[in-house]
Amino acid sequence: MDDPEGTNGVGAGCTGWFEVEAVIERRTGDNISDDEDETADDSGTDLIEFIDDSVQSTTQAEAEAARALFNVQEGVDDINAVCALKRKFAACSESAVEDCVDRAANVCVSWKYKNKECTHRKRKIIELEDSGYGNTEVETEQMAHQVESQNGDADLNDSESSGVGASSDVSSETDVDSCNTVPLQNISNILHNSNTKATLLYKFKEAYGVSFMELVRPFKSDKTSCTDWCITGYGISPSVAESLKVLIKQHSIYTHLQCLTCDRGIILLLLIRFKCSKNRLTVAKLMSNLLSIPETCMIIEPPKLRSQACALYWFRTAMSNISDVQGTTPEWIDRLTVLQHSFNDDIFDLSEMIQWAYDNDITDDSDIAYKYAQLADVNSNAAAFLRSNAQAKIVKDCGVMCRHYKRAEKRGMTMGQWIQSRCEKTNDGGNWRPIVQFLRYQNIEFTAFLVAFKQFLQGVPKKSCMLLCGPANTGKSYFGMSLIHFLKGCIISYVNSKSHFWLQPLSDAKLGMIDDVTAISWTYIDDYMRNALDGNDISIDVKHRALVQLKCPPLIITSNTNAGKDSRWPYLHSRLTVFEFNNPFPFDANGNPVYKINDENWKSFFSRTWCKLGLIEEEDKENDGGNISTFKCSAGQNPRHIRS
């Protein structure tokens, strides 16, 4: 097969080399025929416009036209950008406002347009309703003026940009609307987040017809514990609300559950009494797990316990078909709704309060007020005390009367009766041996101690003052303080000797003690208190009263100085019964005292040595029960009716 013309092989393709062979029909010097005379008609017309001179001018014109078009396009883009920027900060359109109203808590703003053909258009706000976010009337008016001024600027900008062309406004309308929507959404979110609780309270009142804050008493601290809580939750699914009735049983004693529906879903109202006290943080965490909603969608506060209107609300709704009630009704609801409880709550009996303080041996005013107030849930008289406007006066009167009764009762008792009453108020289980072992450890003969202790308790003249002396850390104060604590005696200190009333506690005590007496104290005792050490009658200055004459109770004195042998105070030698403690007080490896002396051990000691101390009396020999009658400060009641 012949090769193709003009190629040098098929395999080379278009990229290969090829040879072109020219066909020569005429050579130089050949004669030219007449038919081919080139000069015959060579007028040059065929060479006209052979070279196109208009190419340069056309290219320049096209470049200038492209540049002008580019400038025009850039101008249009710049105008559109400026217009969009101006309209972005101008007031939103009426449709955008309506969309924002639906999202941002029903803020209704309507606009009225007048004189649209005029150059300067004005917009007036014809309606401004409450937004629900707590704005005052002044703030709403300021917002209205701001929107109006922004609309005026927007109209002016629109009129200025209209000269460029209406096509730019139409092309950027979608972008501008999207730009206007973004800031309105941000504002709506900010208002919603900053007023979450207000929105939830509004939705609750809209659904239930009653304010949630009227049913509760707000707690400022989240750490305050309480057994009764009132809880409202939002956005709960129906299945979760139904399952809550079963899940909450294991945590509560009483539950009152209500569920209503609104545009935010199911709104739950729960009154619950837990098995133990819980704070708000614990309750929020528990309910968030049970309801599957965040803690921000709940409001948790304790209910009002003294509001009769609130109690009636819970009482009436408990009988309706929208409530699910489980457990025993709390006592505060019964107290405020049952007629008999209301009658009883209005009566306060001071004698009942005094009897309670006397029976529980509470004489301090602060303890009386605090402990009696804790009984308000179970004692109607205590509840009436809390409702009284004269609680301070009642507490003061109760404390004064209780102290009067206790003082008179103590004065009417002998030393044996007083020790017996103290033993009755002390628990059993003590051992008297540590006391005896400690005395022997200090080289004190137990029999000699019993003889001296018997005279000491009986108040024998010149034998009613016991001195425990010796070096430091030998257990003198430990031994004396334990005895004073058991017999509920008084302690006087020389530091108050400048006061006229520093001996006043001795007027109400069966036993007294002066601890760590120094040389200056011994001098004062030697000068002014010899009669007191003798056990004779003395005169004591008592505050707000005339001088009181009484027999000084037995005194225990601890000192590092043995005044019974010191020559500086010779007149005290015969008035002091001295016991020396010379050995250091022993402790075990754990730092606990080897000889434990407490109230139980003293009770065992007195029970063991009762007869040897001469505390038995004639009434005890008859074995006819206690010789102290029970005190009653309230009048008895006759349960039977008096017949006419």
Swiss-Prot record:
Gene: E1
Binding positions (ATP): 470-477
Organism: Human papillomavirus 58
UniProt-listed SUPFAM superfamilies: Origin of replication-binding domain, RBD-like, P-loop containing nucleoside triphosphate hydrolases
Pfam families: PPV_E1_C (PF00519), PPV_E1_DBD (PF20450), PPV_E1_N (PF00524)
Annotated protein name in UniProt: Replication protein E1
Residue ranges annotated for the SF3 helicase domain, each copy included: 444-594
Motif Nuclear localization signal per record, residues: 86-88
Subunit structure comment from the entry: Can form hexamers. Interacts with E2 protein; this interaction increases E1 DNA binding specificity. Interacts with host DNA polymerase subunit POLA2. Interacts with host single stranded DNA-binding protein RPA1. Interacts with host TOP1; this interaction stimulates the enzymatic activity of TOP1.
The record's account of how the chain is modified after translation: Phosphorylated.
Enzyme Commission number, as recorded: 5.6.2.4
InterPro entries assigned: Helicase_SF3_DNA-vir, P-loop_NTPase, PPV_DNA_helicase_E1_C, PPV_DNA_helicase_E1_N, PPV_E1_DBD, PPV_E1_DBD_sf, Rep_E1_papillomaV, Znf_lg_T-Ag_D1_dom_sf
Cross-link (Glycyl lysine isopeptide (Lys-Gly) (interchain with G-Cter in SUMO)): 551
Main enzyme class: isomerase
UniProt keyword terms in alphabetical order: ATP-binding, DNA replication, DNA-binding, Early protein, Helicase, Host nucleus, Hydrolase, Isomerase, Isopeptide bond, Nucleotide-binding, Phosphoprotein, Ubl conjugation
Main function: ATP-dependent DNA 3'-5' helicase required for initiation of viral DNA replication. It forms a complex with the viral E2 protein. The E1-E2 complex binds to the replication origin which contains binding sites for both proteins. During the initial step, a dimer of E1 interacts with a dimer of protein E2 leading to a complex that binds the viral origin of replication with high specificity. Then, a second dimer of E1 displaces the E2 dimer in an ATP-dependent manner to form the E1 tetramer.
